[in-house]
């Protein structure tokens, strides 16, 4: 299982470039280990401690050959470099097609379904897209073991397009080069990444800072809160 992820993500006009280093423990003895990554993303290289590793790609499955047998309980690290666009058809394979394709209506409007967004103005990557490599096969209709859940530590660096702000789990900080870092206080199962023209509104109470981020032009709530400002 993976106990540590170190990411770097660069947003581009219509896709993204990423490098992810994973550190983990072998749950079984083997030389070849299985990872899952969205099939729309192209793996450029895989290495371990600077040494290139052979790998085979079959849609979402990436088989990585470490070149030597790792015993159960051994620790190892592996780095993926990849880029591209998310393939939405891979999302929610565990949900029956008739449920996914069922019409959703609100009054006269058909509500479309979109699992991620990749444009020059907005990026949204949720865990269901498998936008970063994860150990195992992802969904399987033959073995329920794919549903195993592990908690990992995440450290994320993001370089957004000019004028945009990234958001993810953990406290975010930016440097003079416009690179943002996020690091959670506790391990989590998965993480998401959103990048857009976000604006922050904050209030401090009892030494705790509460913040809301909204897209520019989407502040539909501040005026309604004026009358209770002293209460909240």
Please place each PLM-identified region on the residue numbering.
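Intrinsic-disorder/low-complexity, polar/charged segments enriched in Ser/Thr/Lys/Arg/Asp/Glu/Gln
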Residues: 4, 15-21, 30-32, 61, ...
